[in-house]
């Protein structure tokens, strides 16, 4: 028979009493009434906030979007296949946030900032709210520094500044993504952090973009946020805000950032799907009433910060797809009215072999020449005027049989100017090369060449100028002015190269 030692028992009880920690926890718990199509209806979550994260019994996270008198409408961040009717749901008391750090550079992540490139976890000590308020008027300053895209047509006639929002709009397969990716490639060595957000794209298209960045060394300063076409609507809706939060992290650390949204119309479609399933009343094109606010609160986060906040910047390039050139549809008109200008890509120009297929006539930058260096302003003013006159003349010349010599010359000049705007994909040009190209065209040095020879001549001229007249590049990059000395050097190079080129062509 075992003997019970009273002192041992009393010691154990005393220890347990000392270790007892009286902690009162209030947990807000509800019950699943209905689940399906990425939406759950919850009963009993009385004190949940709008936009609060809720956790289901089997681990799925959701966002409380509809707060109704009898239940709460929650959108699921996952397939939610294991959620059962009657299971419990817990309110977390948190709003959606993501970890942020320098370690994200060079990585491919999803809308929840989890890596999807198979290269392990990303370390981060800080976190940011996915949705945070845009900088106010006092916190900003006007845009004055250029963000070079490397594309002559844009940098000369539709210039983009750091902190600007410029829409890239056009039909499918007109090179919209190519313009955006070329801009990222051109930021190499410019100390600009780039974020590329792919919303509802094909996984193969995203992989192609990532491969291009890796081959060209652009992933060193780029983060790719990808939610492909098979992702749940909730994650497609969140992806742009995740990208903006990452770009903001760098912006508030006195860095310059560039963010590409490809494309917000897919985000609007995902939001429409969520809203209709939540039984919100539909409006124009079945979009909910707050679809304008969906995009405005995203794009307003792009800014050029004032000196008190460190002069960082976030430049946004949203890409919107139109249906057979219709820019008067709901989402295109919304985004046009939010942004500071648009670059319009035309299917007709693309099919005619003019690539990048930028329709300069209806594209506009509301920042204008404030976002150009002085040297570019000096040579580019003439280009836009001559191209506009050429477009008008070309339409007229189709009906006229006999044209006078001056008109013929103007048409010939216009055709050569159009030729110099053509560029291969993933071949951005430096500002110095652009200035040299525009000057050569607008001052008539290409007029004596055949149209087919123009591009070959310009490529050879760029190489010749770089090797034989390096002072030209030094003058432009140091002074930012197209000085008389630079002009003289350029004229010499053009004459010398033209003689060599014409001799080569004879043999």
Swiss-Prot record:
The keyword Thylakoid applies. It comes from the Eukaryota. It is an enzyme of class 7 (translocase). ATP binds at residues 170-177. It holds the Pfam family ATP-synt_ab_N. One of its GO terms (cellular component) is chloroplast thylakoid membrane. Keywords: ATP synthesis, ATP-binding, CF(1), Chloroplast, Hydrogen ion transport, Ion transport, Membrane, Nucleotide-binding, Plastid, Thylakoid, Translocase, Transport. It catalyses: ATP + H2O + 4 H(+)(in) = ADP + phosphate + 5 H(+)(out). It is a peripheral membrane protein. Its EC number is 7.1.2.2. PROSITE patterns: ATPASE_ALPHA_BETA. GO terms for molecular function: ATP binding; proton-transporting ATP synthase activity, rotational mechanism. The record marks 363 as: Required for activity. It is found in: Plastid, Chloroplast thylakoid membrane. PANTHER family: ATP SYNTHASE SUBUNIT ALPHA, MITOCHONDRIAL (PTHR48082:SF2). Belongs to the ATPase alpha/beta chains family. F-type ATPases have 2 components, CF(1) - the catalytic core - and CF(0) - the membrane proton channel. CF(1) has five subunits: alpha(3), beta(3), gamma(1), delta(1), epsilon(1). CF(0) has four main subunits: a, b, b' and c. Produces ATP from ADP in the presence of a proton gradient across the membrane. The alpha chain is a regulatory subunit. This is ATP synthase subunit alpha, chloroplastic. It comes from Citrus sinensis (Sweet orange). The gene is atpA.
């Amino acid at each position: 028979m075992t003997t019970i030692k009273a002192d041992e028992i009393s010691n154990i009880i005393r220890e347990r009493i000392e270790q007892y920690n009286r902690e009162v926890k209030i947990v807000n718990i509800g019950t699943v009434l209905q689940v399906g199509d990425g939406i759950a209806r919850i009963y009993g979550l009385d004190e949940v906030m709008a936009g609060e994260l809720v956790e289901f019994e089997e681990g799925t996270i959701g966002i409380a979007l509809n707060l109704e008198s009898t239940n709460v409408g929650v959108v699921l961040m996952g397939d939610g296949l294991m959620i059962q009717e009657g299971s419990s749901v817990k309110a977390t008391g948190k709003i959606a946030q993501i970890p942020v750090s320098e370690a994200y550079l060079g990585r491919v992540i999803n809308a929840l900032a989890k890596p999807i490139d198979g290269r392990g976890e990303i370390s981060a000590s800080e976190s940011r709210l996915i949705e945070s308020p845009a900088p106010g008027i006092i916190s900003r300053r006007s845009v004055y520094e250029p963000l070079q895209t490397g594309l002559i047509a844009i940098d000369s006639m539709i210039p983009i500044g750091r902190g600007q929002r410029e829409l890239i709009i056009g039909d499918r397969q007109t090179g919209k993504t190519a313009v955006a990716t070329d801009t990222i490639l051109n930021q190499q060595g410019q100390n600009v952090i780039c974020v590329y957000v792919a919303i509802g794209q094909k996984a193969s298209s995203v992989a192609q973009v990532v491969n291009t960045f890796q081959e060209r060394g652009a992933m060193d300063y780029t983060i790719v946020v990808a939610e492909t076409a098979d992702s749940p609507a909730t994650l497609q809706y969140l992806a742009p805000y995740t990208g903006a939060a990452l770009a903001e992290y760098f912006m508030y650390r006195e860095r310059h950032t560039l963010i590409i949204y490809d494309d917000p119309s897919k985000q609007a479609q995902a939001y429409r799907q969520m809203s209709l399933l939540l039984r919100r009343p539909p409006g124009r094109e079945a979009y909910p009433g707050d679809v304008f606010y969906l995009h405005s609160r995203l794009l307003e986060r792009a800014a050029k910060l004032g000196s008190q906040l460190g002069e960082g910047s976030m430049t946004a390039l949203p890409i919107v797809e139109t249906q057979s050139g219709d820019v008067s549809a709901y989402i295109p008109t919304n985004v046009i009215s939010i942004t500071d200008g648009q670059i319009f890509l035309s299917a007709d120009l693309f099919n005619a072999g003019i690539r990048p297929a930028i329709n300069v006539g209806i594209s506009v930058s509301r920042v204008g020449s404030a976002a150009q260096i002085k040297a570019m302003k000096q040579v580019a003013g003439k280009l836009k005027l001559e191209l506009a006159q050429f477009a008008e003349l070309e339409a007229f010349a189709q009906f006229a049989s006999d044209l006078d010599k001056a008109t013929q010359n103007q048409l010939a000049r216009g055709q050569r100017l159009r030729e110099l705007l053509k560029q291969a994909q993933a071949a951005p040009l430096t500002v110095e090369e652009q200035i040299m190209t525009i000057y050569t065209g607008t001052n008539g040095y290409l007029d004596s060449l055949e149209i087919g020879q123009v591009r070959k001549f310009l490529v050879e001229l760029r190489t010749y100028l770089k090797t034989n007249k390096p002072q030209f590049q030094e003058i432009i990059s140091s002074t930012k002015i197209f000085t008389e000395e630079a002009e003289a050097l350029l004229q010499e190079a053009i004459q010398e190269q033209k003689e060599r080129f014409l001799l080569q062509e004879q043999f």
